[in-house]
Amino acid sequence: MEVILLEKVANLGNLGDKVNIKGGYARNFLLPQGKATVATAENVAAFEARRAELEKAAAEKKAAAEARAAQLSELVVTLGAHAGDEGKLFGSIGTRDIAEAVSAAGYPLEKAEVRLPNGALRNTGEFDVAVHLHTDVETTLKLIIVAE
């Protein structure tokens, strides 16, 4: 199925690209989320008419994400958790806990924007947590886990 991308999609293409993808990916993900439209002749013409508007909106989203990244990169968040004598936590700190702590500090953050490639954090100490705010904008914030 051939579609026109209405925004940048990771591992697929940029705004305005015509890409050939599997039908299920288009019907179940890209089309319902408004990230693409079917590449018919009238949709191509409609897209070209709206191209400048879509590019401006994409640039604004990226600028907003870069501003958030600048704020978050300077942020140090401290979380308290129950831990044993050797610093091993009773439980773990996951993406939801980190997002809630950052949001409580006054910087709204969604759980889906937090990246923990090695899984949940299970020890006390300092950690650099990756935050993915936009397809082109990624930053890290410092997280300190202390025993309560």
Swiss-Prot record:
UniProt KW keywords: Ribonucleoprotein, Ribosomal protein, RNA-binding, rRNA-binding
Keyword Magnesium listed: no
Name listed for the protein in its UniProt record: Large ribosomal subunit protein bL9
SUPFAM superfamilies reported for this sequence: L9 N-domain-like, Ribosomal protein L9 C-domain
Record's function text: Binds to the 23S rRNA.
Gene Ontology MF: a single term: rRNA binding
Gene Ontology annotations for the cellular component aspect, listed alphabetically: ribonucleoprotein complex; ribosome
Domain of life: Bacteria
Record Pfam families: Ribosomal_L9_C (PF03948), Ribosomal_L9_N (PF01281)
GO biological-process terms attached to the record: translation
InterPro entries: Ribosomal_bL9, Ribosomal_bL9/RNase_H1_N, Ribosomal_bL9_bac/chp, Ribosomal_bL9_C, Ribosomal_bL9_C_sf, Ribosomal_bL9_N, Ribosomal_bL9_N_sf
Family: Belongs to the bacterial ribosomal protein bL9 family.
Coiled-coil region list: none
UniProt source species: Pseudomonas paraeruginosa (strain DSM 24068 / PA7)
RNA-binding as UniProt keyword: yes
